[in-house]
Amino acid sequence: VIVVAAAAGGVGGLVTQLALARGATVIGIAGPSNAEYLRSLGAIPVSYGEGLEQRIREAAPSPVTAFVDCFGGYASLAHSLGVPGERVGTLVPTPAIALRRARFTGGRDGKIADIATVAGLIDRGTVSLTIAGTYPFELEQVRAAYSELMSGHVRGKIVITIP
């Protein structure tokens, strides 16, 4: 069982789909408004907030063995669930992550082969990319896109179109 924090976001949604494509059971942490979306992907939705650890334990059909934090701040939760540091990945490095020996899994040094693999999964319909909104490359529109992003409740990716 893999837990994905921010599972309905752009990166979290892809992580969720990739894990499911590899046969994992995924518990996705997201807001209540995204529960049906996560179910449609094949994940088990769990709402964030008070009592999160207990809700994850109740939803998990077997012990949690990995944790991917696409939001930041969930290192202690992963630890409380018994996930070893080397089985925790995050996009947001913090001192707590370093202390628990978790992996920082972001960066610009992707591999061409990884891109080809994901592109193949998208072509076959195994993975889909959710677009939260599309904005033209104009100052006010870019500001609007940024405001939407900073709201913290974007499902999928925001696209800026350049003519």
Set out the residue ranges of the language-model regions.
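Terminal helix/beta-alpha structural elements that buttress the NAD(P)+-binding lobe
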Residues: 1-163
